[in-house]
From Swiss-Prot:
NCBIfam families (UniProt xref): ureG
BP GO annotations: urea catabolic process
Alphabetical list of Pfam families matching this protein: cobW
Protein name as annotated: Urease accessory protein UreG
Organism expressing this protein natively: Mycolicibacterium vanbaalenii (strain DSM 7251 / JCM 13017 / BCRC 16820 / KCTC 9966 / NRRL B-24157 / PYR-1) (Mycobacterium vanbaalenii)
Binding site for GTP: G33, P34, V35, G36, S37, G38, K39, T40
Annotated spans, Disordered: 1-26
Length: 226
């Protein structure tokens, strides 16, 4: 599927009404986070675990390339026609929050080609701790950080860390190598998030991303019960 492009218009901040998912529509889960946090690897892991039990597709966002979509295709996590890409230009957060038109068009194309979809995973381009998805684009969102940035990242907060539906602290196996204290990260995540869930994971240790997979399955169960 050819990439969709975000046109070069001014980056105004526009509020869209929260998407109201209709019965029979696929659940849309956003996966966001900084560059290198492991978003694409997490998306790949979820696809491998879910592809035999439901109908799903993936939409990636990259600034100037289709690198993340190409990675998913090379690793054959889904058939090629179930993986689409948006090229966002200079501001990756704009395409998922402010001007979501290119993403909505790509989602429409995926649904037109696969009218049985249960789930669409929408991966953002790599951005910073302020990037979040528009509620007009996704139903729920996962925000991925990793321990390589140090154990201070959760207490820095930011919309993604604080308000995402699920926070994932990835690459916990690297903690000893970078001097990160996982208990500090756990404590600080709990402090900034309150009752919102978070998980510490390592795809090197648990390639299925079991806690995240369980959370996604629960979101699907709730959505399909409506």
């Amino acid at each position: 599927m050819p990439p969709h492009f975000l046109d070069g218009q001014p980056h105004g901040h526009t509020d869209r009404p929260r998407r109201v998912r209709q019965p029979g529509e696929p659940l849309r889960i956003g996966v966001g986070g900084p560059v290198g946090s492991g978003k694409t690897a997490l998306v790949a892991a979820l696809c491998r675990q879910l592809r035999d039990e439901l109908s799903l597709a993936v939409l990636t966002n990259d600034i100037y390339t289709t690198e993340d979509a190409d990675f998913l295709r090379r690793h054959a996590v889904l058939p090629d026609d179930r993986i689409a890409a948006v090229q966002t230009g200079g501001c990756p957060h704009t395409a998922i929050r402010d001007d979501i038109t290119a993403n909505l068009d790509a989602i429409d194309d995926l649904i037109a080609g696969h009218d049985d979809l249960d789930l669409i995973l929408v991966e953002s381009g790599g951005d910073n701790l302020t990037a979040t998805f528009s509620s007009g684009l996704v139903d729920v969102q996962i925000f991925v950080i990793d321990v390589a940035g140090g154990d201070k990242v959760p207490r820095k907060g930011g919309p993604g860390v604080t308000f995402s539906d699920l926070l994932v602290v990835n690459k916990t196996d690297l903690a000893p190598l970078v001097g990160a204290d996982l208990e500090v990260m756990r404590r600080d995540a709990a402090a900034v998030r309150g009752d919102r869930p978070f998980e510490l994971i390592s795809l090197a240790v648990d390639p299925a991303a079991t806690p995240v997979l369980s959370w996604v399955r629960e979101q699907l169960r709730v959505a399909q019960a409506v």
